[in-house]
């Protein structure tokens, strides 16, 4: 919804995880980027900005990964407009939040017919 309401704003996604995480960007960062692309179909994902020169293009969605220490997981979606910035952030301070989500998903799935389900189905 933010991508739709703030359609003239630049979007950058930043995710941070511990130094043992092997994938980059994280699945959650990719999910956020794909949600933006559903609204802004012309979006072009830019993974980092190293070596890029020139002005930022309107359709760019920057995706950045940070790895260090024992960061469990942090995700930020930055909407940068003229003279204002809106950020949506989520920080997981322990892996318990993921375990709770997995348990909730299992409880949902046990009552469903065989098939493929996603978070939208569960959150309904």
State where each predicted segment sits.
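Rossmann-fold NAD(P)-binding glycine/threonine-rich loop
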Residues: 1-2
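C-terminal substrate-binding/catalytic lobe of Rossmann-fold NAD(P)-dependent oxidoreductases
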Residues: 7-124
């Amino acid at each position: 919804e933010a991508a739709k309401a703030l359609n003239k704003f630049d979007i950058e996604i930043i995710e941070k995880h511990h130094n043992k995480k092997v994938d980059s960007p994280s699945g959650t960062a990719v999910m956020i980027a794909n949600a933006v692309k559903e609204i802004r179909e012309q979006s072009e994902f830019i993974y980092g900005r190293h070596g890029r020169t020139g002005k930022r293009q309107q359709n760019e969605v920057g995706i950045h990964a940070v790895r260090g220490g024992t960061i469990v997981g942090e995700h930020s979606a930055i909407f940068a407009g003229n003279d204002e910035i809106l950020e949506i952030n989520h920080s997981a301070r322990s892996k318990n939040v993921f375990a709770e989500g997995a348990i909730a998903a299992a409880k949902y799935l046990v009552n469903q017919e065989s098939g493929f389900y996603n978070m939208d189905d569960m959150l309904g």
